[in-house]
Amino acid sequence: SLTLWAGQTKMPGNRQRLVSSQALQLVDRSQVNSIFNIDRDIGVHLHGQFQVGSVVLRPIFAFAKGEGRNIIANNIGGFSYTGKLEILPFGLFESKGDYFEADLKREQKPKLSLAASATYNEGASRDKQTGTFLIDTAGDYMANNLLTVLGDVMFKYKGFSLLAEGAFKQVMLKSGQSLSTTDSTLVSVGGKSYQTGWGVSAQAGYLFKHNIELAARYTRVVPDWSKSFTGLDEYTIGLSKYVVGHKLKVQTDVTLIDEFDNSDYSLRYRLQVEVAF
């Protein structure tokens, strides 16, 4: 089957960005998502779903404005082009469980989804698909081409769930450009740059009786020459009580943060009650 979407919506990038913020296993998404996701844009998407034996294939193509969310007028650079493929070798998840975290349906057979996407954004003017506009020393919007490659794995079986993601983003250099902090075509007048580099994140959880889940996550993000974020490792452990699935839950987590340019560690604790209608 084929489905055509048009308008502003989430781009077909990493899985954790596509999962609703109300359907997460921990209090918030990972730093890999925060830094490298391709967020939302205005455009046209073609979604396919085909089955070959027990294997489900989902090819997706998107043509978008390339300016990110809520930019209706003007187009500073060019457009963005995205292709994605999802492979579900063991068939569909119950209740679309490949797009919510935690195995709340307690899959009775192993379910796996593998996905990869690539986005080419022509003349990008923001530090990522959303975020700060970059202005050069002449007072003009910067416009450089960005390549973003994303991949993820989702697995669920009898209360156990695993989500792993990888991301890579780079500027496609033009003639005369160099990855230098002094290159005014790549670093804004405010000292900011595109959020380029790579990152990995892996999280797993087990849903015990009474819908209590213990989960853990490891995250690493590494900038190449970017001035917009700091490289770090994060180690998170969390506990959730799902009262009515993701619609009513209590979640808490604690994270040890190791920033590469800081000899000290920091600790972050979070607690939330979430209600959704």
Residue positions per predicted region:
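Beta-barrel outer-membrane channel/assembly domains of diderm bacteria
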Residues: S1-L2, R40-P59, D136, V153-K158, ...
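Outer-membrane beta-barrel "beta-signal"
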Residues: T82-L92, L239-K241, L248, D264-F277
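Outer-membrane beta-barrel and related beta-rich outer-membrane complex signature
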Residues: Q16-S20, I71-A73, R126-K128, K174-S178, ...
